[in-house]
């Protein structure tokens, strides 16, 4: 293994990533499970594969593998979304983050402080996908000192509809009492 080895010495990762394109759905599901089990070692190669994917099916299976990898993929995925402005890449990366649930909430909210409007939009959609676990952390940001975060929290709770609106309304009522 060399320091510049993109696969961290694991030659099976590229093979498994290619297996995500296999005509057999069983082979694709197997590849997802094995890649997810590899944890952090599979994250960067999967992110590169997601960025290089030529169609939505390929993006979908790479995103699912990243989602199943879980916590080790959160920060690298957000960092990749900040650098890669391709809409489809961001959309599928956000879907992966949204599937990770509660562990992704705080990193997603923190990343919404970005000046990049499109990035904030896809991060918001990921939080909407997470749903209820994101409501309290977003509600706490309604009075954040950062105007962008306040605005993003408000809009995200609004987009959540019945899941986010009651919490937002309660926060506004509490602020009026003070």
Model-derived features: positions:
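A conserved position within tetratricopeptide repeats
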Residues: 20, 50, 81, 112, ...
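Glycine-centered loop/turn positions within well-structured domains
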Residues: 136
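Structural detector for internal amphipathic alpha-helices that build alpha-solenoid repeat scaffolds
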Residues: 1-10, 18, 25-40, 48, ...
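Short glycine/proline-centered loop/turn elements that form peptide/ligand docking sites
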Residues: 45
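Terminal, low-structured helical/coil segments at or just beyond the last alpha-helical repeat
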Residues: 166-178
């Amino acid at each position: 293994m060399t320091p510049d080895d993109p696969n961290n010495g694991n030659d099976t990762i590229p093979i498994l990533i290619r297996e995500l394109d296999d005509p057999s759905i069983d082979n694709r599901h197997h590849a997802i499970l094995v890649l997810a089990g590899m944890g952090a070692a599979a994250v960067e190669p999967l992110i590169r594969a997601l960025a290089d994917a030529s169609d939505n099916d390929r993006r979908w299976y790479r995103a699912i593998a990243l989602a199943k990898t879980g916590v080790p993929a959160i920060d690298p995925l957000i960092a990749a979304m900040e650098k890669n402005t391709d809409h489809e890449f961001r959309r599928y990366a956000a879907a992966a983050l949204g599937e990770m649930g509660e562990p992704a909430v705080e990193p997603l909210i923190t990343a919404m402080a970005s000046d990049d409007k499109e990035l904030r939009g896809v991060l918001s959609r990921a939080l909407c996908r997470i749903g209820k676990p994101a409501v309290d952390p977003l509600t706490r940001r309604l009075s954040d000192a950062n105007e962008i975060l306040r605005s993003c929290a408000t809009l995200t709770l609004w987009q959540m509809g019945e899941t986010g609106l009651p919490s937002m309304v309660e926060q506004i009522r509490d602020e009026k009492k003070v």
